[in-house]
Structure formats: structure tokens, C-alpha cells
């Protein structure tokens, strides 16, 4: 019996090693995770590594091109663009993490229960259909217009817009797992619905939902920047990536760095998150394993 336990323990250890090797061999996951970690590190360390106050106005340095003193140049008010972009990273990552996190929790809950209980699912899916019937950005603009601009309202708006995506994915997987023979056996043996949902169905739903969360994170980064660019998101003079591009659009031919620098951060973040999502899908999806 002891030998059998040792063999099982050794097999589990080897399985973990193989999984770890497969994870790090997936270039999309590694590159995407590296980009995300760098962005999160910049967001956390922004107050420490920013060379200047992002709100400090100095008209003498107005629209200076990139140089040793100002690596990314300055904006129309003489503010250091690197400092503003770093603080903008904090805002974008904060919004992305909060929206993705709350959407994951709420969407997973709604998806599990709507898939397991048909009547409740009918109500939830009508809500999802109503939300997705309107283009996400247009709906976000309308909601922010009603609630008012500001970081909290932007986060709340993007959560509302993002929940249906998680809910639909979670519900779809729940419906598939619910029809499995072992679930029917658990129901016949008298197992509670609560136990079946959270202990037997949820572990099968989580991997696919996590992939969707990474794509939602990327969408949120673009949406937050778009709302700020349209002056209905993070209010000026807060250093959001969208605000910086909005300020730079009037001097685009004179000061290209005001568009290129924040745009590069947006592109890098979205590309990294999409690569992470694609890699996670290859790694976690049982159909590709």
C-alpha cells in the first residue's frame, strides 16, 4: 500500500513538472505574462520612478521634444510626458484589474446558476442580450453620460458592459458539463445542487473563463482610453492615456510624441494581454491538449 501511495505521489509530481514545462514553452503565455507584469510593476512603482510631478505645469518647457531631461518630451502645459504616462499606466491597470475581477466573480456566479437553473437562466440571458444588443463603447458612453465622468463611474460602467461576456461563456460550459453522466449520478445520489455547482461544475468552467478574462482586460484598457479621449472618462488633468492623446491631437504634426508615446503603451498592453489570452487558451483548453 505504501508503495502504491509513493507511485501516485511520484506520478503527480511528474505531471506538475510536465505542466510547468509546457507552460513555459508556450511563447504567447510567457511574452503576454511578461508584458502584463511589466505594466503592473510600472503602475505600482509610478510614484517612485516618475521623474517629475505629472500635474506640475511649466510653460517654459512647453512642447519640448524628447531629450535627456525629458525622455518622452513635454505636453502643451510643459508637463513631463513620461511621468504622465507612468501615472496613466496606474489608472489603466487599476481600471483593468477591478473591472476584470468584478466581471469574473459576478459573471461566473450568473453563468453557473443560469446554466444549472433554466428559468433563472432565461432571465439572465435576456439581460445579457439587452446589454450586447448595443455596441459596448456606445453603451459605455451612454452610461457614463448618465452617471457622470470619473474613475468610479468608468469602472462601474465597464463592469456592466463586461459581465455578459463572462456570463455567456460560463453558462455555455455549465450546460455542457451538466449533461455529463457523473453529474447525473451525483444528482441521483442525493448530492445538493450547491455542492454540484461549486465543487463539480465550477472547476470545469474556470479555465475557459480565465481565458475570456484576459481578453476582457485588453478590451477594458482600450475602452478606458477611448472614454477618456472622448472626454467622458477620467477627467482632465488626470494623466490617463486617453487624456494625453486627446491633448496631443491638436498638435499632432508639431509634437508627434504626445500621440506616439501613450499610443505605444496602449498597443503594448493590448497586444500582451491578447497574447496571454491566446496562450492560456492553448494551455488550458482540453480540446487543444
Predicted regions and their residues:
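Transmembrane alpha-helical segments of polytopic membrane transport and secretion proteins
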Residues: 1-34, 275-289
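Hydrophobic alpha-helical transmembrane segments of membrane transport/permease proteins
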Residues: 42-77, 230-238
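Transmembrane alpha-helix signature in integral membrane proteins
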Residues: 81-116
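Loop-to-helix entry region at the N-terminal start of transmembrane alpha-helices
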Residues: 83-96, 145-165, 257-263
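C-terminal transmembrane helix and the adjacent membrane-cytosol boundary/short C-terminal tail
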Residues: 147, 160-161, 207, 211-217, ...
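Generic hydrophobic transmembrane alpha-helix motif, especially the helices
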Residues: 71, 75, 107, 112-116, ...
Amino acid at each position: 500500500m505504501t508503495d502504491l501511495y509513493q507511485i501516485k505521489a511520484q506520478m503527480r509530481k511528474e505531471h506538475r513538472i510536465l505542466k510547468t514545462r509546457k507552460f513555459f514553452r508556450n511563447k504567447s503565455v510567457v511574452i503576454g505574462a511578461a508584458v502584463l507584469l511589466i505594466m503592473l510593476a510600472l503602475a505600482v512603482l509610478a510614484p517612485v520612478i516618475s521623474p517629475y510631478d505629472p500635474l506640475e505645469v511649466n510653460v517654459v518647457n512647453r512642447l519640448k521634444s524628447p531629450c535627456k531631461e525629458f525622455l518622452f518630451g513635454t505636453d502643451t502645459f510643459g508637463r513631463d510626458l513620461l511621468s504622465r504616462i507612468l501615472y496613466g499606466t496606474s489608472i489603466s491597470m487599476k481600471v483593468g484589474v477591478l473591472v476584470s475581477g468584478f466581471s469574473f466573480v459576478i459573471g461566473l456566479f450568473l453563468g453557473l446558476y443560469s446554466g444549472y437553473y433554466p428559468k433563472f437562466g432565461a432571465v439572465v440571458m435576456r439581460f445579457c442580450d439587452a446589454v450586447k444588443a448595443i455596441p459596448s463603447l456606445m453603451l459605455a458612453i451612454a452610461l457614463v453620460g448618465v452617471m457622470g465622468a470619473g474613475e468610479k463611474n468608468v469602472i462601474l460602467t465597464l463592469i456592466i458592459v463586461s459581465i455578459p461576456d463572462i456570463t455567456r461563456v460560463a453558462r455555455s460550459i455549465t450546460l455542457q458539463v451538466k449533461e455529463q453522466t457523473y453529474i447525473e449520478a451525483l444528482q441521483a445520489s442525493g448530492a445538493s445542487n450547491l455542492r454540484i455547482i461549486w465543487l463539480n461544475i465550477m472547476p470545469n468552467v474556470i479555465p475557459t473563463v480565465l481565458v475570456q478574462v484576459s481578453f476582457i482586460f485588453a478590451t477594458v484598457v482600450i475602452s478606458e482610453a477611448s472614454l477618456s479621449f472622448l472626454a467622458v472618462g477620467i477627467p482632465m488633468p488626470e494623466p490617463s492615456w486617453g487624456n494625453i492623446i486627446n491633448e496631443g491631437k491638436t498638435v499632432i504634426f508639431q509634437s508627434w510624441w504626445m500621440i506616439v508615446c501613450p499610443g505605444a503603451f496602449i498597443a503594448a498592453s493590448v497586444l500582451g494581454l491578447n497574447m496571454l489570452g491566446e496562450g492560456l487558451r492553448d494551455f488550458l483548453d482540453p480540446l487543444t491538449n
